[in-house]
Amino acid sequence: MYKAFGIVSSSGRNIYVDGMQDYRPIGAFSFLGRYRVIDFPISNMTNSDIDRIQVYINNKPRSVVEHVGTGRHYNINSKSGKLQLLFSEHNNDNDIYNTDISCYLDNMESLSRMYHPYVVIAPSYMVYSIDFDQFLHTHIDSGADVTLLYHAVDNAKEAYLTCNVLGLNRQKGVESIEPNHGNKKNQYVYMDTCVMKTELFISLIKEAKNLSSMYTLTDILNDKCETLDIRGVAHKGFFASITDFPSYYAANMALLNYKSAQELFHDNWPIYTRTNDSCPTQYFNTADVKNSVISNGCQIEGTVENSVIGRGCVIKKGAVVRNSVILAEATVGEGVHVENEVVDKWAKLVHKKEIVSPTEQPGYIRRNDTL
């Protein structure tokens, strides 16, 4: 691979997942039972032989720091590789100033010391698989200044409303990067993933700071569409943008479909995560499990259908869990019916026997809550 280092960026101020983000950033969200969302961009980089990675964190860093740690579990070469956790030194009470550009400026010394000629930037809040080696080769062969990754969708009126979309010409040149206003169903969703020369990246950061304290990297790239050669490359396969509560729930539910899961997980493309040495899940005689993902360390006595169950959960006898995402160490008591819910860590559903939300508007049970 051409020498490139990786940046895993944090979510912007326009992105917020109600309830769950009160406790941790999106990158630290539990995903499909055993993973965290941030495992996907980091694994994509290490599988692509990118072994120098910077992970940027804006706020509530504890969960990300605990999970990512030194990065050893991501198969990073311990001699030549390194994973850095970098923070915004001047986190402002006024959120309009907490941009990715301000975070990069706070860590300009670390950026300036990177000797790699190219940088690959990917978000901590999107789930997909990609070979960044091939992505970088495509960029270099094209002669473009910047190459952006996009995913073509046909439901942009209802989904991806907090994402940006690309305006492309017939040669896949990027003419604009604008918010998705939900007025067209067919759009090219920008995956907040790009590649460029490190020298250009640093110059764009400095120029963005001079133009506006509110500017993001996307803003300055949009300004440069007329003067730089910016091109788009299409992504194929499973793609989820976790930018609000419905999209988090939908992403977990979508991967219960085996065909969708095959588009994300490949035999030769492992998704690394921090291991947890817990015992296998116990299924009792009364257990009835259908089309679900069950993590290690659980005790299942009740019925589980079309659901994702995190590590160490307890589903008591007579309990029914349908179309739900249950995070680690939660308990569903005897005779409790849970449907269309996201249940956060350590919650205990024991007294209220019917906890059901509408299919089109899944509910949320807070962390460490008792119902």
Across the structure, where does each feature detected by a protein language model lie?
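Left-handed beta-helix
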Residues: 1-10, 199, 209-371
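Unchanged
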Residues: 1-254, 365
